[in-house]
């Protein structure tokens, strides 16, 4: 779980563009964030399996 200060710090626009990074909107995790959903892979998997993300379902073939 990310500290509240890190979540607030991430929302500020950096002076240089390369200093910017993404965080999960749900838990604040800085790695493996899906830009389209603004969620990390773990939160995305949990919410998708519960059916809480519209238009997303588990693939089977």
Swiss-Prot record:
Native source species: Spiroplasma citri
List, separated by semicolons, the cofactors it needs. Answer: Zn(2+)
Q: Output the superkingdom of the source species.
A: Bacteria
SUPFAM superfamilies, per this entry? Glucocorticoid receptor-like (DNA-binding domain) (SSF57716)
| One of the Pfam families matching this protein, by short name | Ribosomal_S14
Q: Name one GO cellular component term.
A: small ribosomal subunit
This protein's UniProt keywords: Metal-binding, Ribonucleoprotein, Ribosomal protein, RNA-binding, rRNA-binding, Zinc
User: Mind telling me what this protein is named?
Assistant: Small ribosomal subunit protein uS14
Its function, per the record, reads:
Binds 16S rRNA, required for the assembly of 30S particles and may also be responsible for determining the conformation of the 16S rRNA at the A site.
User: How does this polypeptide assemble, per the annotation?
Assistant: Part of the 30S ribosomal subunit. Contacts proteins S3 and S10.
Give the GO biological process terms: translation
Cofactor info, note text: Binds 1 zinc ion per subunit.
Among PANTHER family, the record links this protein to:
30S RIBOSOMAL PROTEIN S14, SMALL RIBOSOMAL SUBUNIT PROTEIN US14M
Q: Which GO terms describe its molecular function?
A: rRNA binding; structural constituent of ribosome; zinc ion binding
Q: Which family does it belong to?
A: Belongs to the universal ribosomal protein uS14 family. Zinc-binding uS14 subfamily.
Does the keyword Protein transport belong to this entry?
no
Q: Which InterPro entries match?
A: Ribosomal_uS14, Ribosomal_uS14_bact, Ribosomal_uS14_CS, Ribosomal_uS14_sf
Tell me yes or no: is S-adenosyl-L-methionine among this UniProt entry's keywords: no
Quick one: which residues bind Zn(2+)?
24, 27, 40, 43
